[in-house]
Amino acid sequence: MVRELTHFIGGKHTPGASGTYGDVYDPNTGRVQARVPLAGRSETEAAIADAAEAQVEWGEWNPQRRARVLLRFLQLVEKEKDSLARLLSSEHGKTVADAHGDLARGLDVVEFAAGVPHLLKGEFSDNAGAGIDVHSLRRPLGVVAGITPFNFPAMIPLWKAAPALACGNAFILKPSERDPSVPLRLAELFLEAGLPPGVLNVVNGGKEAVDTLLEDPRVKALGFVGSTPIAAHIYATAAAHGKRAQCFGGAKNHMIVMPDADLDQAVDALIGAGYGSAGERCMAISVAVPVGEETADALVAKLTERIAGLRIGRSDDPDADFGPLVGRDAVDRVRGYVDLGVEEGAELVVDGRDFTLEGHEDGFFAGASLFDRVTPEMRIYQEEIFGPVVSVVRAADYEEALRLPSEHQYGNGVALFTRDGDIARDFTRRVETGMVGVNVPIPVPVAYHTFGGWKRSGFGDLNQHGPDAIRFYTRTKTVTSRWPASGIRDGASFTIPTMG
């Protein structure tokens, strides 16, 4: 039976009114399991109006009261995390264990945002001038919005919504129409936790909904995670309409493996970071850079052996290392890139194009592929594949290995495996990426640090979660005061005031 999904506006499930729907698939079988309404302009404007009205009161709640809502939300999610993980897995295709991780990393940011009474403390300067004190306030923006991707249907919405709500904003979430059920359930749980109706609205939709959020002057800021072309477009359009924007695009994350590295440790890291979640992660390691031919030969041999032992299965198979991709188009894209790599002259060591899961021939499965002797001019190196494909680019020495991620158009994350502290320190200072891991395969920062890439991986000067999130979702007001007012007896002054 195909489920009928809704929007979530004003604390209620709202049926679609546009007459346009998208299909939500079961990636394991390729069959449609739900229909999701795609909002038009009028529905999106209604959600904005509702949020603007609700935000007035919410923004005046004291920070500790808002934080208590987040803490109650954490308790509610904890009680049903197993069912949420299964629901997430059934629509996305990642394993249930991986879905638990998706939820957990999102909840980390909710915990961070619950510290908002401390995070919103302003600055104070006593007696900055004769009887003058200066202090700053952080005030909410009003209505803000988030456009989030299919690959983390719990984590990314929570990364954006939790700090925004904690700071006193109303939040409109436009999740991916591929797997919208978990975002809708999270909105219900926020309501149960005490969030006033309308402070968090969920609008499913496509371009028309996004354009409305970008153009409506009541929306003051917008966050996006997705492909680089769309990130660049949304950033430019938001700026043209006077909005703040933080937009995160594609990635081509490298792992540098030095000759002195623990090779078994590096292979373990690369197998998980390259093929986990079928490679559908913005922090996936898609490029391995062994330094020296001996290191490269040993790395490729060990990787080939490990790939042969990978178990690809249904997303609810507890023994599966990874499950299906999110859609048929994703499978076709991955196979197309493997075809392209062969045409470009890369050595295809492991070919996963023809993989099928017995009994699930219509499922969206792709096997693990491994290329060796990839070179920087190849498109399979330059472009994000977003699937279970790892490319090995051999570097003659450390300096060549350092140049590869530094000169790439994307600058999201990079990992270095070495036992040499001097090399590690030099690398972390010089490499041109926003996030760096040393003997850490997926360098996703903890919630109280910021997450974001450089170059064409990120647009905007403030990143996700951590202190940057608080700055992004607030504006600063600086107050200069002197008391009592009757103490001003010097008469009019026509020169700029100084504090001397």
Segments from the language model and where they lie:
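Hydrophobic face of amphipathic alpha-helices that form TPR/SEL1-like repeat modules
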Residues: M1-N28, R353
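Short, solvent-exposed loop/turn elements at beta->coil junctions and helix N-caps
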Residues: R72, G131-D133, G352-G359, P441-P443
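Rossmann-like NAD(P) dinucleotide-binding subdomain of oxidoreductase/dehydrogenase enzymes
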Residues: G122-D268, A395, G460
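Glycine-rich loop-to-alpha-helix module at the N-terminal edge of alpha/beta enzyme cores
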Residues: R31-L120, G131
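Conserved C-terminal structural/oligomerization subdomain of aldehyde/semialdehyde dehydrogenase
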Residues: T29-R35, V219, I256, T304-R306, ...
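Short, well-ordered beta-strand elements within core beta-sheets of diverse protein domains
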Residues: Q33-A39, A54-E60, G146, M255-M258, ...
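ALDH superfamily catalytic-core signature
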Residues: P229-T375, L404, V438, A485-R489, ...
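Residue-level signal for inorganic ion chemistry
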Residues: G30, R66, L88, V110, ...
